[in-house]
Amino acid sequence: VLRSLHAHAAGWTARLGYRISVYATPSESLTDRFCRLDRERFGAVPDITDKDYYTNSFHYDVRKSPTPFEKLDFEAEYARYTSGGFIHYCEYPVLQQNPKALEAVWDYAYDRVGYLGTNTPIDRCYPCGFTGDFDPTARGFACPSCGNADPRTCDVVKRTCGYLGNPQQRPMVHGRHAEI
């Protein structure tokens, strides 16, 4: 699909005289909206429209639980077709006690990908003092220690479409939340 989009963009550039490119990090809401529209049109197709979201950009499907190295190897070949922009990113557990693990991924990525984002859990619950990764729930995120989900007394930080944000304060679309 990306090769075809890239070829079409090159053809339009040649024909129109304007630089046309493929941007591989689309609007986060499209991962939800397009899946809903396709499910309405084609029904629940196993592993495609039955999971409430489309995987963003050319990212490795999160349901497969790849290692960071597998994810980077899988995604590396696609960036060449997306001259309008792209991002690779990897999710990690709490690595404060093991920074060498994070450095190993950065070293591995250095010659393989052009832009790498790093996501490590930094959620915080003020009532109980928990710091780490909050649990996703049907309505947002909750502290795994005490169950707190009050946006006034906790801070949740997640990366959405390459940007860090607080989904407790500004909830993400259903499809993106389902993917997480």
Q: How does the language model describe each region?
A:
Residues 1-180:
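Long, C-terminal-biased catalytic regions of enzyme "large/alpha" subunits
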